[in-house]
């Protein structure tokens, strides 16, 4: 072999040596800067995520050299790459724990057994069916806990757990040691999500301490302490906030349980965490890895880092980004969300049915949701790979940055007196509200898009029919509230736009099926009007407006007369910035003379305020553009035409 080819930097063709990595990156950056033609690199190619972290267009080894966890393996502290060394053929890497709606415990059991035969391998037990021993026994009839562990978040109070589960186990002829899974109480998240508790936190902690101590002696395979931070995401918060809140709640439980004579060594293995899965694939994947890192750090502070591996993580697809409109797109959303969770190393996953925000999920939607989780494991074989994302420079760097962001937020909560004190003072609510406000603004300007709702809506879609599936009864609510706070209220990204479409549908129903209309006054050749005509049609379609006006016009007067004659209450002039100074005065004056009540809109926003003012004086009522508040503007226009 030649000496040239022996060199690790030699060109395979025998030419010049391959430049080192630093030189290649420098050349790449110089080439990119040249192509950007003066546009700042950071503005064009760097994306700021909701967590306040910059996503780079290119990641390289140098970015992760200082990241401390990169040389660890799955099953090794700090367990960022998973609590266990996974990847063996046939090994269950994660449990599939699907929600099963049912009107009674018997119906639930029947549907559950059928689901277990079709690939589900964990029981997600509704709190309503854990209210008494008889109901619980009926719900869990013929369920073998070794093959299908039970996940039962019972709510704020642990008082009845020992009696109800003890009674159910006795009726089955089994000991407590047979029970596997997580039977958890979580008063802190219940208080945050609902704003009230039927008992004091001190009383709730005493119940949780008693249940945890009992389980530690009698039910070694059962988690008892729930920490559900999903309310942060459902309230519009970001991943860093969700992680910080989860850690803050766990530390609050540690303190309170220690005061109730349950030490950290007993409590740490009993934690069962739950998170909502958001829509951003890589940040969500990194979130679950970052959680393990943070949890290991917390448990290490209490004396034994190895105990961190025993906590379990359940992930459920969030409701925040699910839609009533174009609901079949929800299947795509839940698929990528579930994938990010399982690649992030969760212990169990719950995939929401595509119609869950529309109606009680039917048999079809439940089957599709279950099959998504099964396919990730059985067909795509992700269960056979340990930490498949490990080693990705993007994932490793983002994991590290996200963990640091979350830890900083956690420290702020601690300075506020811990989670309970911060919640009582409204600080947790303010934290989430700030992120939610940013998301609302991004949604309203379509910087954050919801496909089928505020982007590319389908006005011809047929709504889903009513479900014949009975809903699961709600768990008993406390008669009185012993503790109250302002709740972190859940909302959905699409709900404001869905409300606009509902107004539009009512308008159509009251007008013989005719939707509210907007006339597009297209000027000149296709290249002159098409970009803004397409933008305008999409803009108004978000609120259910039908765009009319197929032909293009040579003169502004012609366009104005056609708009007035169309019967549409709104007309949009679609052309280019350089033609508007000539077109606007003639169009607006002719239009208002022919039909004084019509709303005149200009597609585009002039760069200077003086031109905007002159166009308004000419008769233009408003402007639509990429920075416009879409939702507010459409709501105002619907109101102007009498739609309610």
Language-model segments: residues:
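Active-site capping/gating regions of soluble enzymes
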Residues: 2-4, 15-16, 246-253, 266, ...
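Catalytic alpha/beta active-site cores
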Residues: 2-280, 284, 302-305, 310-314, ...
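Intrinsic disorder at enzyme termini
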Residues: 2-26, 41-47, 51-83, 347, ...
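Short, conserved glycine- and acidic-residue-centered signature motifs
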Residues: 243, 365, 533
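Active-site-adjacent loop and "lid" segments of alpha/beta metabolic enzymes
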Residues: 325-337, 523, 527, 531, ...
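A general structural motif
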Residues: 329-332, 550-556
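C-terminal accessory/binding modules appended to enzymatic or scaffolding proteins
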Residues: 498-544
């Amino acid at each position: 072999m030649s000496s040239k080819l022996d060199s690790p930097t030699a060109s395979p063709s025998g030419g010049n040596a391959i430049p080192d990595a630093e030189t290649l990156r420098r050349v790449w950056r110089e080439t990119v800067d040249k192509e950007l033609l003066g546009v700042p690199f950071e503005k064009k190619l760097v994306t700021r995520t909701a967590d306040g972290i910059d996503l780079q267009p290119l990641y390289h080894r140098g970015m992760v050299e200082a990241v401390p966890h990169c040389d660890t393996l799955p099953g090794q502290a700090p367990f960022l790459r998973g609590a266990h060394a996974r990847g063996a053929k046939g090994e269950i890497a994660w449990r599939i724990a699907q929600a099963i709606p049912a009107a009674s415990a018997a119906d639930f059991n029947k549907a559950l057994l059928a689901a277990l035969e079709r690939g589900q391998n964990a029981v997600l037990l509704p709190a309503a069916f854990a209210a008494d021993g008889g109901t619980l026994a009926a719900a869990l009839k013929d369920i073998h806990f070794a093959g299908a562990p039970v996940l039962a978040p019972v709510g704020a109070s642990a008082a009845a757990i020992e009696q109800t589960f003890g009674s159910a186990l006795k009726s089955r002829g089994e000991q407590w040691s047979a029970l596997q899974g997580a039977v958890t109480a979580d008063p802190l998240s219940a208080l945050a999500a609902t704003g009230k508790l039927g008992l004091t936190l001190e009383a709730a902690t005493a119940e949780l301490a008693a249940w945890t101590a009992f389980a530690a002696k009698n039910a070694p395979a059962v988690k008892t302490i729930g920490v559900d931070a999903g309310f942060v995401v459902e309230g519009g918060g970001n991943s860093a906030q969700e992680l910080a809140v989860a850690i803050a709640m766990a530390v609050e439980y540690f303190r309170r349980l220690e005061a109730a004579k349950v030490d950290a060594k007993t409590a740490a293995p009993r934690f069962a965490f739950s998170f909502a899965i958001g829509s951003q694939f890589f940040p969500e994947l990194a979130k679950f890895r970052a959680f393990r890192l943070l949890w290991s750090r917390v448990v290490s502070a209490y004396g034994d880092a190895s105990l961190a591996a025993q906590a379990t993580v359940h992930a459920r697809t969030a409701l925040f980004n699910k839609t009533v409109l174009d609901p079949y797109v929800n299947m795509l959303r839940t698929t990528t969300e579930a994938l990010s969770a399982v690649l992030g190393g969760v212990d169990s996953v719950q995939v929401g049915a595509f119609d869950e925000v529309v109606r009680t999920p039917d048999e079809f939607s439940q089957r599709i949701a279950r099959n998504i989780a099964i396919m990730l494991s059985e067909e795509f074989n992700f269960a056979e790979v340990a930490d498949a994302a490990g080693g990705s420079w993007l994932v490793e760097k983002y994991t590290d940055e996200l963990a640091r962001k979350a830890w900083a937020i956690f420290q702020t909560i601690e300075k506020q007196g811990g989670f309970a004190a911060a919640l009582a003072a409204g600080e947790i609510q303010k934290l989430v509200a700030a992120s939610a406000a940013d998301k609302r603004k991004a949604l309203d300007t379509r910087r954050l898009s919801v496909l089928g709702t505020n982007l590319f809506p389908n006005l011809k879609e047929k709504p889903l029919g009513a479900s014949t599936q009975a809903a699961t009864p709600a768990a008993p609510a406390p008669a009185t509230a012993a503790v109250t706070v302002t709740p972190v209220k859940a909302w959905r990204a699409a709900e404001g736009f869905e409300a606009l479409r509902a107004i539009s549908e009512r308008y159509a129903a009251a007008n013989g099926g005719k939707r509210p209309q907007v006339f597009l006054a297209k000027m000149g050749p296709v290249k002159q009007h098409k970009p803004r005509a397409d933008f305008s049609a999409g803009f108004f379609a978000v609120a259910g407006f039908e765009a009319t006006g197929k032909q293009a016009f040579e003169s502004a007067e012609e366009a104005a007369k056609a708009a007035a004659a169309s019967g549409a209450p709104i007309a949009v002039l679609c052309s280019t910035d350089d033609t508007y100074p000539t077109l606007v005065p003639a169009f607006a004056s002719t239009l208002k003379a022919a039909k004084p009540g019509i709303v005149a809109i200009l597609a585009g926003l002039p760069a200077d305020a003086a031109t905007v003012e002159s166009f308004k004086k000419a008769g233009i009522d408003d402007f639509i553009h990429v920075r416009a508040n879409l939702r507010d503007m459409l709501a105002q226009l619907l109101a102007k035409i009498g739609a309610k």
